[in-house]
Amino acid sequence: MAFSERTRAARPLSDTTLAYFPDARFAPSDRDRAARVRCTYQCSHTRSWRAVAVSDNDSRYGHIPVMLDRCYELLAPALTADSTDGSGAVLVDATLGAGGHTEHFLTMLPGLTVIGLDRDTNALDIARSRLAPFGTRFVGVHTRYDGLADALDGLGYRTTSSVDGVLFDLGVSSMQLDQAERGFAYSVDAPLDMRMNAQDELTAADILNTYSAVELSRVLSRFGEERFARRIADEIVRRRANEPFTRSGQLVELLYATIPAATRRTGGHPAKRTFQALRIAVNAELESLATAIPAAMAALRPGGRVAVMAYQSLEDKIVKAEFAAATASRSPIDLPVELPGDAPEFTAITRGAERANDEEIEVNPRSAPVRLRAVERVADRRNA
């Protein structure tokens, strides 16, 4: 869709946000800019709109939950199947962060229990403080999302058919971006860390200073889809022979010098793909996701739902493939009837990937690249 004008976003944006989303300061909208700030959500395949106010609590914690109402709409039918207030239902927030999504679910459904997972101890502490008013209805667990099955087992739940909903909000959080010392942002000079869990050993500096040129090139190409991966890798190896990489500024300077000027002018920030690749490698994000999605689907009771928000194509490809396999029939394609036991155990409840609309992007630039997909587990036909 083309827009005839570009207007400024309704609130100031941090340098780190602009570094990851450089177009965020120009959010197209035909709405009245004097109106009170609101978020709206639109399914990319429908014309229905819904508006909600942005919570002051979200602003206080430096993070506005993405597609909040739409996530609730998708998961609520599973959470209220037995009771309208969610009594007896269990939701796993596999990427707890500041707890914005969880707070909304606990507020809307006063009988619901939420298990929140996060690898970042700082985020977990913030969420526990924020969600303390909900008492025992919230349980926080320090683990990556691929530790979902172990977390359930440790809390006394079965690892299969025991929960009613699972929510994933993938990628780096706004809180992490805004903490310069974490090293996620390339707009400020900071230590080359990038660990989401400070207890992990591997850092971005370790990768830059110890991987061979071939290994570096593979990381940049696979996780960053960087066209100039080998050129960058060779230059990293050459420079580190004289001085090890310790600061993000060193790497950004190298990237400006290595990536051709024509690409720098048209391809976005030259550091974007390299920083993404290093972050994914440091935190084993794709490997974790490939384990976590099947575990989440296995944990669902019949009628349970899982919703996943992905922010870049590598994540979305994994989610799309897992959901496609789960919703496909195993019967031969030329048979006129479904064979017993071959019907899919899941059905799609989003038509492809849903997107945030322009008004939400104006208020919350982090929502611009999001892709939201959801599936529901149907009755186990093998036992029917």
Swiss-Prot record:
It catalyses: cytidine(1402) in 16S rRNA + S-adenosyl-L-methionine = N(4)-methylcytidine(1402) in 16S rRNA + S-adenosyl-L-homocysteine + H(+). It comes from the Bacteria. SUPFAM superfamilies: Putative methyltransferase TM0872, insert domain, S-adenosyl-L-methionine-dependent methyltransferases. It is found in: Cytoplasm. GO terms for molecular function: rRNA (cytosine-N4-)-methyltransferase activity. S-adenosyl-L-methionine binds at G99, G100, H101, D118, Y145, D169, Q176. PANTHER family: 12S RRNA N4-METHYLCYTIDINE METHYLTRANSFERASE, S-ADENOSYL-METHYLTRANSFERASE MRAW. Specifically methylates the N4 position of cytidine in position 1402 (C1402) of 16S rRNA. This is Ribosomal RNA small subunit methyltransferase H.
